[in-house]
A protein has these predicted regions:
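Active-site-facing alpha/beta catalytic cores
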Residues: 2-6, 73, 86-241, 245-246, ...
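N- or domain-start disorder-to-order transition segments that initiate the globular core
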Residues: 9-48
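Gly-rich Lys/Arg/Thr-decorated short loops/hinges at beta-loop-alpha junctions or inter-strand turns
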Residues: 18-27, 223-235, 318
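Conserved phosphate/anionic-ligand binding catalytic regions in large, soluble enzymes, centered on
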Residues: 55-68, 326
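Conserved, mostly hydrophobic/aromatic
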Residues: 59, 264, 330
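A contiguous, surface-oriented mixed alpha/beta subdomain in the mid-to-C-terminal portion of proteins
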Residues: 233-236, 240, 248-263
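Internal helix-turn-beta structural module
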Residues: 304-347
Length: 350
């Protein structure tokens, strides 16, 4: 008797466009490439302590409406220019969302938000949007969730994140070791920092792993290691943005032979999932920076045109410029917190 033992739970397999198809359709312009190169260099210098500005990764929790995102980007670019003496502002452009259980996984996975999962469409939309944002002079940041998607968009990312759910994953540490941009590792969902510290050391080393080429062929990838990695404090069972927590992290980093470079996420467990509390976290962090704390090299903020969030499940028409995932602060608060951070940096300089 013959047994069928393979693909028993696979309903359908569809061909994915090879990365080269989108790289040729939407090649990086000279402006876009220049934006990425300069932002990566600036972040590298901040991480090495050669630039005393603050890295600010700010933007929507997730991207679902390119039109609203372009408007947000245009506004943010104006602020980036105004505050460039104190802040290196990079827009958070997250196309993929890790879920605790189930839910909408982001624009690349389900661009039409109707469970049609037109991933080829999602990749096209994502690359074109990233290209437009970078071409305008605004650098972009994203979260990396798998080993394939970076081949479509990583050349347009100035900074990358590995999330709390994936920081402990060997695959993601290997991926980070080969990314061309600086990478931040979040502490674990329970608040432990050791997994992030271990991840930084692991990503700094060379690795050999499986991925795909730009032509979509399965490949063996050898990396040289990424020396531009750092920790992101996002809270856990309790917030971990206070001066006491920062001091503890500095000790942990020193024991691991790593520089005291810390990014603080104003959202997630640090704000107890209450978006308005990002302003309270920001006030505390500004106080630490103004007080001379140089280990805080960056912050992350969830912000959109309209504050709060909305449900995809309600069946109601979506509000323009409002998050469909985590709640964000609105534009007015965005301007306020960025100017406060810039003033804190000025004070830190003395």
């Amino acid at each position: 008797m013959n047994y069928q033992n393979d693909d028993l739970r696979i309903k359908e397999i569809n061909e994915l466009l090879p990365p080269v198809a989108l790289l040729e359709k939407f090649p990086a312009t000279e402006n876009a490439a220049n934006t990425v190169a300069h932002a990566r260099k600036a972040i590298h210098q901040i991480l090495k302590g050669d630039d005393d500005r603050l890295l600010v990764v700010i933007g929507p929790c997730s991207i679902h409406d390119p039109a609203a995102v372009k408007e947000y980007a245009a506004r943010l670019l104006t602020l980036r220019e105004a505050l460039k003496g104190e802040l290196e502002i990079v827009m958070r452009v997250y196309f993929e969302k890790p879920r605790t259980t189930v839910g909408w996984k982001g624009l690349i996975n389900d661009p039409h938000m109707d469970n049609s999962f037109r991933i080829n469409d999602g990749l096209r939309i994502a690359r074109k949007l990233l290209l437009d944002i970078n071409d305008s002079g605004l650098p972009a940041a994203g979260e990396f969730l798998d080993m394939i998607t970076p081949q479509y968009v990583a050349d347009l990312m100035s900074w990358g994140a590995i999330g709390a759910r994936t920081t402990e994953s060997q695959v993601h540490r290997e991926l980070a070791s080969g990314l061309s941009c600086p990478v931040g590792f979040k502490n674990g969902t329970d608040g432990t920092i050791k997994v992030a510290i271990d991840a930084i050391n692991a990503a700094g080393a060379p690795h050999c792993f499986l991925s795909v080429t730009k032509w979509g062929h399965s490949a063996i990838v050898n990396t040289s290691g990424n020396g531009d990695c750092h920790i992101i404090l996002r809270g856990g069972k309790e917030p971990n943005y206070s001066a006491k927590h920062v001091a503890e992290v500095k000790i942990g980093l020193a024991k691991a032979g790593l520089p005291a470079q810390v990014m603080i996420d104003f959202s997630h467990a640090n704000s107890s999932k209450q978006f308005k509390k990002q302003m309270e976290v920001g006030a505390d962090v500004c106080q630490q920076i103004a007080g001379g704390e140089r280990a805080i090299m960056g912050v992350m903020i969830e912000s959109h045109l309209v504050e709060g969030n909305q449900s995809l499940e309600s069946g109601e028409p979506l509000t323009y410029g409002k998050s469909v995932t985590d709640a964000c602060i609105g534009w007015e608060d965005t301007e306020t917190i960025l100017r406060q951070l810039a003033e804190a940096v000025k004070t830190r300089r003395g």
